Amino acid sequence: FWRFGYTNAANDNGTGVATAMATAHDLWADMPKDWSVEVLLTGAEEAGMIGAQRWLDDHKDMINKDDFYVLIIDTVCAGTLHYVEKTGTFTTLDYDNKLVDIARDLSRCDARFNAVKSKAHRVADFDSVWFARAGISALTLGSYDENGLMPHLHRPEDTIEHVDPDCVNEAVKFSIAVAKKLMA
């Protein structure tokens, strides 16, 4: 904001919301009866990840860590889809949990997802940080360009014209595959 003013956030946040809704729609249509899929829109990490933290604080007594999973879908607008294994600028948080294991397995063993890579995200964190720190299995998906950056993030060109529908569709398919493997 300080350098460029407000941006449209088509890539950052818009693609994540679209992917989350498309993923949930698919899962709701064909879901085991003992499973529940909910979509939580936290207000984005730009708000200090307070939405995710507040939701967790309000619901932590209802969460069974053995059967509660969080999939965060951030900027999936262009470039190559990645699953995040580490985050943090000053301190590192390792995401070592069941969802990351599933993402790693899918990217290595399922030919549809061989292009999906792991990522150590060194600039700040994602909404998943609160869940991971609480011992809840959490996975973040994001897309990165050839320089390891999230395309158009917080820039004036963060517009619908810079969204690659193929990248968004890949994120939807990968998210569904992660969830279905978890449910199997």
Q: Which residues are covered by each model-predicted region?
A:
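Acidic/histidine-rich catalytic neighborhood of metal-dependent amide-processing enzymes
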Residues: W2-Y95, I102, F113, A124-D127
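Active-site-adjacent substrate-binding region
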Residues: V76-A184
